[in-house]
């Protein structure tokens, strides 16, 4: 399963939910909206 908004993530292995336009923040290491 992909990671939801605000969940901890790894920028080098981004598992945030792309269908929700989420990307892993390089700075904060959590999933945020990428727009």
Swiss-Prot record:
GO terms for cellular component: extracellular region. Keywords: Disulfide bond, Ion channel impairing toxin, Knottin, Neurotoxin, Secreted, Toxin, Voltage-gated sodium channel impairing toxin. Signal peptide: none annotated. Pfam families: Toxin_12. PROSITE patterns: HWTX_1. Expressed by the venom gland. The keyword Transcription does not apply. Its main location: secreted. Disulfide bonds join 2-17, 9-24, 16-31. It is found in: Secreted. One of its GO terms (molecular function) is toxin activity. InterPro entries: Huwentoxin-1, Huwentoxin_CS1. The keyword Mitochondrion does not apply. Spider venom neurotoxin that blocks voltage-gated sodium channel Nav1.3/SCN3A in human (IC(50)=1 uM) and rat (IC(50)=1 uM). Belongs to the neurotoxin 10 (Hwtx-1) family. 10 (haplotoxin-1) subfamily. The presence of a 'disulfide through disulfide knot' structurally defines this protein as a knottin. Negative results: has no effect on human and rat Nav1.8/SCN10A. Has no effect on voltage-gated potassium channel human Kv11.1/KCNH2/ERG at 10 uM. This is Beta-theraphotoxin-Hlv1a. It comes from Cyriopagopus lividus.
